[in-house]
Amino acid sequence: MMRIALFLLTNLAVMVVFGLVLSLTGIQSSSVQGLMIMALLFGFGGSFVSLLMSKWMALRSVGGEVIEQPRNERERWLVNTVATQARQAGIAMPQVAIYHAPDINAFATGARRDASLVAVSTGLLQNMSPDEAEAVIAHEISHIANGDMVTMTLIQGVVNTFVIFISRILAQLAAGFMGGNRDEGEESNGNPLIYFAVATVLELVFGILASIITMWFSRHREFHADAGSAKLVGREKMIAALQRLKTSYEPQEATSMMALCINGKSKSLSELFMTHPPLDKRIEALRTGEYLK
């Protein structure tokens, strides 16, 4: 279902835009306390914008279509399955959507537990057995029931705040050092062009490094969503679903969507930057019951 995904690209863009606003409004000349307040507002602002727009952005990204009225037996089964599991998990009925993609995948998103969305690919409906598909849907329902999207928003907000604040403090120091002379007693932050250039570069660099934190949480929540699915439909069904994912096409969803999907891309320079744990680790965690306690 959920997490850091729209977040990485969306928040990166939001922070750069907010960075420009900060520079144009002269916030670099403000006190440390003022800068922290602005960093908090803009840091959490980017996350909450992403959260509030998450359903619209996710559907637009994959070209998904919300099922208003089931048109065939497959759609009817999907809606009924989501409704049954939502009742079991104690959440309101999510919107249900289908999107065209050959890979086996699904995601859930939404600003609140009671205003969420579950979407599945046509590849999942065509290539998974009913038991396997039930397990994947239960995984997404668990993401919603666990409140992962809101938690991710708070984590991303904190990360954004520190990225903005530290980047601009260091940019002030750099601009003051390279900005030339100033009269005694005159307050100056140096060359504003240097300030903005340094702040932007540092935000990008620190943003990439900070993504390690959000990626870790994304992987951690996947284990808990797998465990939630096992509790809803049974451990063996979830294990079978993960084993089926190992034979799936490479996910076709955009990179910014990967953290929302059950089947993340398997290739990565390092597991530190993966949104999902390797499938073998997820299967092993279910077999040992590590997250089922």
Swiss-Prot record:
Residue ranges in the Cytoplasmic topological domain are: 1-3, 55-293
Pfam families recorded:
Peptidase_M48 (PF01435)
The top EC class, named as a word, is: hydrolase
- The record's EC number reads 3.4.24.-
Membrane-topology descriptor: Multi-pass membrane protein
Q: Where is the active site?
A: 140
- Native organism is Escherichia coli (strain K12)
Q: Which Gene3D superfamilies does UniProt cross-reference here?
A: Metalloproteases ('zincins'), catalytic domain
Q: Which cofactor does it need?
A: Zn(2+)
Q: Which UniProt keywords apply?
A: Autocatalytic cleavage, Cell inner membrane, Cell membrane, Hydrolase, Membrane, Metal-binding, Metalloprotease, Protease, Stress response, Transmembrane, Transmembrane helix, Zinc
Q: Where in the cell is it found?
A: Cell inner membrane
Q: Name one GO cellular component term.
A: plasma membrane
The cofactor binding remark recorded in the entry reads: Binds 1 zinc ion per subunit.
The UniProt entry lists the main location of this chain as membrane
Any one Gene Ontology BP term: response to temperature stimulus
Name this protein carries in UniProt: Protease HtpX
- Per the record, what phenotype accompanies loss of this gene's function? No visible phenotype, however one of HtpX or FtsH is essential for cell viability.
Q: Which family does it belong to?
A: Belongs to the peptidase M48B family.
Recorded hits in NCBIfam families, A to Z, give: PRK05457.1
